[in-house]
């Protein structure tokens, strides 16, 4: 690769990283006021002719859940509505990406927080919205936090940027969820340093990335695992 082409490649890659806001990795916009407004909007939408036309005479199920720390519902959702449609169309949370529509690529993955505090991955393109009733989930918009008006990325998000882990970014929200769940598991059940590489591959194996060949994603996760006390045993 010539120096000119290499320079253009580096600039283009940096430009992609600067577009991170558009990929939804660092969004945290649901304060209480926004939550109240969105809840009202959701109820209006579900009473509109648009919803009636799209889901005519379809059985509905009750839905109440926690999303990014805010309670949503109770509302009635069509039995056939997927969770990703609910997030996109009625909560304006578009950072969770629709990929294959079959639960294979894991671009649509969000993180579920269980009552004991443990975390797991859940796909939103293959499960109905009503399936999430009573659950506590975190979308990509809820990963970062704000302090004194300054956005603070999670260690995984920052590591993905530092390692130039992605190019187009379409798979990145799913990788953030998957990597965060993996690190939570390591915190609870540390592993030996010699087993870390294999454990990362096994944990993120189902997440598909068509740009970077996974290596930089895995390197970023490894860096965070090694830098987090208690995750890895020497």
Region locations from a protein language model:
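Signature of N-terminal electron-transfer/Fe-S-associated modules in redox systems
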Residues: 2-234
